[in-house]
Amino acid sequence: MSDHIQKLLPYGYLYLVVLGVVKESIFYYPLDINILKYSSIMDILISPIADLTSYPILILFFIFLGFVLYFFKKYLLKNIDKKSTRKFLKITEDDTSTKDELNQRADTDLIMIFFAMLVCFFLGFGIGGGYKLADRIENGTLNFEKYSQTINFNTGESKEVMVIDHNSIYYFYVEKGKKSIEICPIGSIKSLEKK
């Protein structure tokens, strides 16, 4: 791994933190939940990774995207004399950049493209998912037949619910027949039965 990419890794970590906070906040905004009050910092940090691992096709897509960008970089550096490549890398006629400097420039540009695609994906996922879920709750069109679960509480009470989400501290769910989200601490739940 080049020194340039190693220097960018701390920014990647900071990027992941900010991306997690923004994505979670945007997802829960239409549901009138300030998720930062109900989450630990670890929940926020791992939320982008948790979303990716929830849908294996997304992992494959981002791995594929990484390979595409890698081979695109190889193509750029191999065809450095082409007008389109020079324009993409912002190389002027009197530019005296070395091959290493051009490699570094290509790395930076392609990493920024990858980060921009991640932002677009997670913002779209947060906005679309949050508003769609809020609409389904409001209209009573949640698919309880397919996704319902039974929560058994420590008190002996049981509820048929659709779990919206959970983190290390709380469960967020909609009880069958209701149109509001309930938030329950994990410690008060004895078991969760999936149907």
Protein language model features and the residues they cover:
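Phenylalanine-focused residue identity feature
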Residues: 27, 61-67, 71-72, 88, ...
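Cytosolic juxtamembrane regulatory segments of multi-pass membrane proteins
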Residues: 48-50, 89-113, 148-160
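Juxtamembrane/interface segments at transmembrane-helix termini
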Residues: 75-79, 129-136
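Terminal membrane-proximal soluble interaction domains of membrane-associated proteins
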Residues: 135-195
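N-terminal first transmembrane alpha-helix
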Residues: 1-103
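Residue-identity detector for glycine
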Residues: 12, 20, 66, 124-130, ...
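Internal/C-terminal transmembrane anchor helices
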Residues: 98-134
